[in-house]
Amino acid sequence: LRTQLKVGLSGVKKEDLGRVWVAYEPVWSIGVNGTPASADYAEAMHKEIKTALYEIFGEKAEEIPVLYGGSVNPGNAESLIVQPSIDGLFVGRAAWDADKFNTLIRDALKVYAERVC
């Protein structure tokens, strides 16, 4: 991941970081037959990503949201979004069904409201 981030973000200036978002989606979790990552695994990878971003950009890296994608659905969204290093969700197939997407959004909003209060 570190190498991918360093190569992918080479040339990005610190003053442009407010427009940069990173989404992590394990290849084995993509698609209809994808296996969702556990919340613990996703959290560990997000910590690694944030560490790499800090190595590249220093304290300015805190401006970069890191999202998780990869078979996100209403059944696992809440366990992912409560993780401290996951800043948001990158939703694919679950957004195809309006009811599922609505449930997912409501669950995420509930978690964010609990963080703020």
What are these regions (language model features)?
Residues 42, 83, 95-117:
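C-terminal helical cap(s) of enzyme catalytic domains, especially alpha/beta-barrels
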Residues 59-62, 84-86:
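Short, surface-exposed connector motifs at secondary-structure boundaries
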Residues 1-61:
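Active-site rim beta-loop-alpha module in soluble metabolic enzymes
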Residues 28, 34, 71, 85-104:
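Glycine-rich phosphate-binding active-site loops on the catalytic face of alpha/beta enzymes
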Residues 25, 80, 92:
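Conserved, mostly hydrophobic/aromatic
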Residues 67-76:
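Glycine-rich phosphate-binding loops at beta-strand->alpha-helix junctions
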Residues 23, 67, 90:
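Conserved beta-strand segments that form the floor/walls of ligand-binding pockets within enzyme
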